[in-house]
């Protein structure tokens, strides 16, 4: 029940449909297993990284951004397929499930088929990364190799992160900090000064650190909400998410604190991005109000299928947050 595999797919078939799809078309089944509504998690860090580069250097490379995004999408889709198959093999998907139905558990796709499709997308991510490695060298490998492992190791391997209560930390680091800084690395490289400008690369990376943490925190809200929704089922299947370890009340407070932290750090990120917050603070009002409403929903919504709406709104909130950053003028 990872964020990657469930995410904001509130309108997907529910757990009540288990066993209803044994004869579903394989293409339709594979499309649902890819969880397309969750793939904004790959878009966000690439968008954020390019936004940082644009704000501080005045330009960004669309071709490199597209290559980075496509590679990230392949990794996330592979992760979604692995999660679908591995959670079923570990009996973590049951009839009590309140999230979207899993294709392996429903019988729509076999375990072997789902794993092979996951491997196909993993290979695609590797092939797409080769031009980036050729362009930027070993730092891309340093990011890529752990990313490849955790694509499988999120739910698989000897120490699956999702089963150890490390899902939120993983998302903050890899879908926030690492992905944003990786995008910046692809865009500007590691030279002391950004080519064609007088901007120091260190300033761009410093801004990327703050922005990456903010994006990671808001992505982690989605996995926290996901785990609150699935907590009762996870208690019976041995999946020790943070929601299971902390209890429902503390898990809700943690998700709210992630949203709060993303706004408390705005003055720091605004300075790093050369934004004049004192003159443009009013542009944040829609995002702040949305964030406050989301915090209220996280506190009040019952831990069942009604949380799927909160997941969808969490994704929209992240998009609004980053869109606000993007339209703000620099000093």
Specify the residue positions occupied by each region the protein language model found.
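Topogenic membrane-insertion module of multi-pass membrane proteins
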Residues: 19-67, 71, 171
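Small-residue-rich segments of transmembrane alpha-helices in multi-pass membrane proteins
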Residues: 45-49, 169-184, 244-248, 312-325
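Membrane-embedded alpha-helical segments that form the functional core of polytopic membrane enzymes
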Residues: 48, 57-85, 141-148, 152, ...
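Acidic (Asp/Glu-rich) catalytic motifs at the cytosolic membrane interface
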Residues: 74-98, 220-243
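Multi-pass membrane catalytic core of lipid/isoprenoid biosynthesis enzymes
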Residues: 95-136, 239-276, 316-319
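Intramembrane alpha-helical segments
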Residues: 102-193
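Functional transmembrane core segments of multi-pass inner-membrane proteins
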Residues: 170-231, 249-252
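Extended hydrophobic alpha-helices typical of membrane-associated regions
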Residues: 271-331
């Amino acid at each position: 029940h990872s964020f990657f595999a469930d995410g904001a797919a509130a309108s997907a078939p529910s757990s009540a449909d288990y066993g209803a799809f044994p004869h579903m078309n394989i293409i339709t089944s594979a499309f649902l297993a890819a969880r397309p509504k969750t793939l904004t998690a790959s878009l966000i860090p690439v968008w954020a990284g390019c936004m940082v580069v644009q704000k501080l250097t005045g330009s960004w490379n669309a071709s490199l951004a597209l290559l980075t995004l496509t590679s990230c999408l392949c990794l996330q889709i592979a992760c979604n397929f692995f999660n679908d198959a591995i959670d079923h093999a570990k009996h973590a998907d049951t009839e009590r499930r309140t999230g979207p139905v899993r294709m392996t558990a429903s019988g729509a796709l076999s375990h072997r088929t789902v794993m092979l499709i996951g491997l196909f997308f993993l290979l695609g991510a590797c092939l797409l990364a080769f031009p980036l490695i050729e362009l930027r060298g070993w730092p891309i490998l340093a990011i890529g190799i752990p990313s490849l492992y955790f694509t499988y190791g999120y739910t698989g391997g000897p120490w699956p992160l999702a089963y150890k209560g490390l899902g939120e930390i993983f998302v903050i680091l890899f879908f926030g900090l690492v992905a944003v800084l990786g995008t910046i690395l692809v865009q500007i490289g590691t030279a002391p000064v950004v080519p064609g400008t007088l901007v120091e690369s260190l300033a761009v990376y410093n801004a990327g650190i703050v922005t990456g943490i903010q994006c990671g925190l808001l992505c982690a809200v989605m996995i926290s909400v996901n785990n609150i929704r699935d907590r009762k089922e996870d208690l019976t299947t041995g999946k020790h998410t943070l929601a299971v370890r902390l209890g429902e009340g503390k898990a809700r407070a943690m998700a709210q604190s992630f949203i709060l932290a993303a706004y408390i750090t705005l003055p720091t990120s605004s300075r790093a991005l050369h934004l004049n917050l004192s003159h443009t603070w009013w542009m944040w009002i829609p995002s702040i109000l949305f964030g406050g409403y989301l915090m209220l929903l996280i506190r009040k919504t019952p831990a069942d299928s009604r949380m799927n709406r909160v997941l969808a709104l969490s994704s929209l909130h992240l998009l609004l947050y980053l869109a606000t950053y993007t339209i703000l003028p620099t000093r």
